[in-house]
Amino acid sequence: MSEKHLFTSESVSEGHPDKVADQISDAILDAILAQDPHAHVACETVVYTGTVNVFGEISTSAYVDIAHVVRETIKKIGYTDSENGFDYKSVGVHVSLVEQSSDIAQGVNEAEEVRDKNGQLVDPLDLIGAGDQGMMFGFATNETAEYMPLAISLSHKLVKKLADLRKSGEISYLRPDAKSQVTVEYDDNGKAKRIDTVVISTQHAASARNEEIHDDVINKVIKAVIPAELLDDETKYFINPTGRFVIGGPQGDSGLTGRKIIVDTYGGYAPHGGGAFSGKDATKVDRSASYAARYVAKNIVAAGLAEKAQIQLSYAIGVATPTSINVDTFGTGKVSDDELLAAIRKVFDLRPAGIIQMLDLLRPIYGQTAAYGHFGRTDVELPWEQTDKVEELKSVLGK
């Protein structure tokens, strides 16, 4: 008997301590960009019992009341009562922010391509150099309507549903911290066949009974989110498997910006270059180039040029032009990967300034990405999720 082909991804809710930190960092970024679109921001946050520490490097003309932004973010998440172990009204906020290193700023503000021109006129999109070296990945698949792998798509939707039920008051005992995990079984052709296992752990009031939690999560969350045809009598459910989850959020664990990078992206289905997103402005290619790579991959798949596509980009600090672009369609392409690469070079400008212009990234749009994933979102409008390059790609490839 052959083994099942299983793949698992997880997600966490907005009340998870690492996600609290991400949301604070991105809320600060947005508040700065609202006043100063060209600010350089690298903002990190640590949260733990009763305390928030904000630190990093910021160069801006804006004035932002950091403590106020922190408290409003915590309030919006739902930590509004000391009973939950973390309260926006009483939490201590400590801020330690300095200006961006002049050595880094030199390469970002004037790319190597410009510095080598000896005062000659240059392409304005060569002006911004990459904020660091590194490699970034983008991925898309036709496995779901949002062009995301099924396991991470469902994992996000499960914790988002928990949050919606909590905020609406429909399930009054729910608290902000939660995690989900979905295991998908694939057939021999790599097509999603069924859901093998669902794990959900949700923080709850001390008065809630395990039987009540189990029934509500099964019926009001899992069965409301996962299509019935993917669930069967063999599907396994683990609901709060420790038996109790009253102590949660930053009271239960410390949280740090950038510690949920797989949740933020493709749930482990595609590689990750290692750089986190939250708290970083668009000159940081960890963030902007990852968005651009997703944009490229999604448009390729949406155009019907491949069933799945993976894009790798790499950069050198202070240099505008990518040091490499790699395309892999895993044998599903309707044209060769080399042809796709040539088309990408014609259709997409992948220099940092080109990405910023193409995706309009100098706006305060980042807070909405800091929970429930940066990709495949259908509840918010994100520029890198648009499929507006489909026709241009087809035209370049003669399709």
UniProtKB/Swiss-Prot annotation:
Residues annotated to bind Mg(2+): 18
Principal location listed in the UniProt entry: cytoplasm
Binding site for ATP: 16, 177-179, 244-245, 253, 259-260, 276, 280
GO (cellular component) term, any one: cytoplasm
UniProt GO BP: one-carbon metabolic process; S-adenosylmethionine biosynthetic process
Pathway: Amino-acid biosynthesis; S-adenosyl-L-methionine biosynthesis; S-adenosyl-L-methionine from L-methionine: step 1/1
Span list, region Flexible loop: 100-110
Binding residues annotated for K(+), in chain numbering: 44
Binding site for L-methionine: 57, 100, 253, 284
Localization per record: Cytoplasm
Family the entry assigns: Belongs to the AdoMet synthase family.
Name this protein carries in UniProt: S-adenosylmethionine synthase
Organism: Lactococcus lactis subsp. lactis (strain IL1403)
Organism ancestry: Bacteria, Bacillati, Bacillota, Bacilli, Lactobacillales
